[in-house]
Amino acid sequence: MSLWPPFRCRWKLAPRYSRRASPQQPQQDFEALLAECLRNGCLFEDTSFPATLSSIGSGSLLQKLPPRLQWKRPPELHSNPQFYFAKAKRLDLCQGIVGDCWFLAALQALALHQDILSRVVPLNQSFTEKYAGIFRFWFWHYGNWVPVVIDDRLPVNEAGQLVFVSSTYKNLFWGALLEKAYAKLSGSYEDLQSGQVSEALVDFTGGVTMTINLAEAHGNLWDILIEATYNRTLIGCQTHSGEKILENGLVEGHAYTLTGIRKVTCKHRPEYLVKLRNPWGKVEWKGDWSDSSSKWELLSPKEKILLLRKDNDGEFWMTLQDFKTHFVLLVICKLTPGLLSQEAAQKWTYTMREGRWEKRSTAGGQRQLLQDTFWKNPQFLLSVWRPEEGRRSLRPCSVLVSLLQKPRHRCRKRKPLLAIGFYLYRMNKYHDDQRRLPPEFFQRNTPLSQPDRFLKEKEVSQELCLEPGTYLIVPCILEAHQKSEFVLRVFSRKHIFYEIGSNSGVVFSKEIEDQNERQDEFFTKFFEKHPEINAVQLQNLLNQMTWSSLGSRQPFFSLEACQGILALLDLNASGTMSIQEFRDLWKQLKLSQKVFHKQDRGSGYLNWEQLHAAMREAGIMLSDDVCQLMLIRYGGPRLQMDFVSFIHLMLRVENMEDVFQNLTQDGKGIYLQKPEWMMMALYS
């Protein structure tokens, strides 16, 4: 049975990278343009998205621009410009004058997952090595990954400050350049004004999105959030409509990023908290569990120190109940649909077909028009079954159908979206797939599924539970005789999918690769037996894992190492670790594995130079002396550090960094009472 409530979902899945040009931007060969600029010793200027007001747009955004707007490259704005660096993995982006909080909330969610971010933002780009003023980004665009090439000229005011997206690190520019690339894809900066978080999340990932109306949310919302935060998801949310800042600190009609969740214990009862961030980088919630709330005194000293950061950075905690009260939509995006099904041990497959509604031929409108034109809509046959049981099985199959309409103009906001939906019929008899079903079929048969209402959205989708068999899908526009193109996709465990009367023939479903699926299933089963694990059980769990990038030199986690790891992550001083705490740990372990593997030369150890490089790679700056001391403390007699010791060091440094940042008032020092100091020094 699916964990997720039957709310309207939006589904996406990305095929392999493509070099196709999109309607919004021309085919530009990044490598050829870069080579030409380097050969000629010049900086790239993108004539298809010039540094002029035409790229800003022609609407209300022009009225917000500062006087004497200029376009400058990052090396003109800072003496040491950086494209990206790992230390900035904390939320550092701030919204500019464009009303694109929906885009920035999605971007902040993307920034929390460096492996996903690196697909959209190639992180090896810089302002030094092979710099020619040209940058490239990738977006999932209506079924394909497309590259978007831009120059690095950015709009600034007279003081040289960025007027659109900026970073709290003044020399960091990946966010501003990504916004420019997305504006180019959309038509202009003006075309980024207003939108849905789900739209940007999908364009960044090609992943699976589900939108939950919080007013209708079921009682298992916390379970959904736990599973979502563990499964490499991107999560955004939106407040109720309006345009003002409320007395409680929330902004009406605004998008936020959900950056974390935490179950804490207050006076022997649990409290469920969610952590959110305002894309403005300021203006925070003022209620219970806000930065100045007295509720924090109910926690253990260690838990308070590691969770509470008194800083007007736009990030704050609030209870799950307050979240449901003050927010209207929760948007969860994952790379594969496996998150939404409990059909264990089976891979997902998908099929994607493109089609079009043509005036006076295939644009038949909704079913109420069935007497005249409904039957003229495109018709698709779908056969589904459970692969492990064959086609004679009667057990239901999880199926997801997604209908996505393509833009009707190169500028995102120039032509509004049409109201779209789809109908699903059960086919009880064999049908010749070369002949369109006649009007009589639709007069005699009632749809198994139909739209509650037609939505003017980029995509409409539905999760279905179908008996094995053959079905008919009819995508349509609310009104007949409107021209548009669409993408129709189906996700299931096994299916065949094709268009009636099409020359393209039968399309068999393709497997979706999810390398984490088996691992996730293993963890879930382990914690079903042991809801809270101690150091011995943690040791058992970690030593059962295969560390793929470490090759034949698989690490061994000693009991002492696991006791040290547990002490670092045990915020409520219970001596055990919950599945939520383990999931946080596992994310950090996977990142540490990548960093270690990159610097290791096949010996299974890091020397001083490699350790220094690994720490820099992770965004941690240690002096030479401290780095040497870390080798003495965590390395062996030969001053070499193995993987397990490296993990312990990384976790400890992250822990100490969080303590300092949460407690410091001036960025230079902190104040701790003696009990707090003893707790942090001895049990961490």
Swiss-Prot record:
InterPro entries per the UniProt record, alphabetical: C2_III, Calpain_cysteine_protease, Calpain_domain_III, Calpain_III, Calpain_III_sf, EF-hand-dom_pair, EF_Hand_1_Ca_BS, EF_hand_dom
Domain Calpain catalytic residue range list: 43-336
Cellular compartments per GO CC: cytoplasm
One record GO biological process: proteolysis
EF-hand domain residues: 557-592, 586-621, 651-684
UniProt keyword annotations, A-Z: Calcium, Hydrolase, Metal-binding, Protease, Repeat, Thiol protease
Name of this protein: Calpain-14
Species this protein is from: Homo sapiens (Human)
Organism classification: Eukaryota, Metazoa, Chordata, Craniata, Vertebrata
